[in-house]
Amino acid sequence: MSIKTNEGNLIASGLKFGIVVGRFNEFISSKLLSGAIDGLVRHGADESDITVSWVPGAFEIPIAAQKMANSGKYAAVICVGAVIRGSTPHFDYVAGEVSKGVARISLDTGVPVIFGVLTTDTIEQAIERAGTKAGNKGYDAAVTAIEMANLLNQL
């Protein structure tokens, strides 16, 4: 008896991807977007198969991601943005709701909706995760999207 194993590959050619970007903290989210596009293209995606939708902030990401996921056009939807802690509880509400919303959309639609939204305590932490010391989390989200899209095609 042999065990069947499913594992997604990292080949993006022939797949279409949606990316939702929160404009708030654009100096970070634009770097995450660049990283996501770079990740997709490096793995074989054609730029014409990538659609980017900008929303005002992280809180608005789930509704745009849901619309894209429900459209049937995309193998996966990547969500990027930055929520940076301030001196009020606003951070906790926004970070919690966007993460729950993204997870729910993925489960409800069966489309991989990838959480690439930074939730950091400081601007410095966000900068580190948007292409400096800690890599680019937008790139990482793109690689995850490719793998999950290919995995779900096998299941």
UniProtKB/Swiss-Prot annotation:
What top-level class of enzyme does the UniProt entry assign? transferase
Indicate which residues the UniProt annotation says bind 5-amino-6-(D-ribitylamino)uracil.
Answer: F24, A58, F59, E60, A82, V83, I84, F115
- Which residues are annotated as active site? H90 (proton donor)
Q: What is its EC number?
A: 2.5.1.78
State one molecular function term (GO): 6,7-dimethyl-8-ribityllumazine synthase activity
Q: Where does (2S)-2-hydroxy-3-oxobutyl phosphate bind?
A: S87, T88, R129
Pathway membership of this protein? Cofactor biosynthesis; riboflavin biosynthesis; riboflavin from 2-hydroxy-3-oxobutyl phosphate and 5-amino-6-(D-ribitylamino)uracil: step 1/2
Q: Which GO terms describe its biological process?
A: riboflavin biosynthetic process
Q: Which UniProt keywords apply?
A: Riboflavin biosynthesis, Transferase
Transmembrane intervals:
none
Q: Mind telling me which GO cellular component terms the entry cites?
A: cytosol; riboflavin synthase complex
Q: Which superkingdom, per the lineage? A: Bacteria
- Family matches, as Gene3D superfamilies: Lumazine/riboflavin synthase
| InterPro entries reported in the protein's UniProt record | LS, LS/RS, LS/RS_sf
The record lists the catalysed reaction(s) as:
(2S)-2-hydroxy-3-oxobutyl phosphate + 5-amino-6-(D-ribitylamino)uracil = 6,7-dimethyl-8-(1-D-ribityl)lumazine + phosphate + 2 H2O + H(+)
One Pfam family per UniProt: DMRL_synthase
Which HAMAP family does this one have?
Answer: Lumazine_synth
Described by its record, this protein's role is as follows: Catalyzes the formation of 6,7-dimethyl-8-ribityllumazine by condensation of 5-amino-6-(D-ribitylamino)uracil with 3,4-dihydroxy-2-butanone 4-phosphate. This is the penultimate step in the biosynthesis of riboflavin.
The family note in this entry says: Belongs to the DMRL synthase family.
Q: What is this protein called?
A: 6,7-dimethyl-8-ribityllumazine synthase
Q: Which gene encodes it?
A: ribH
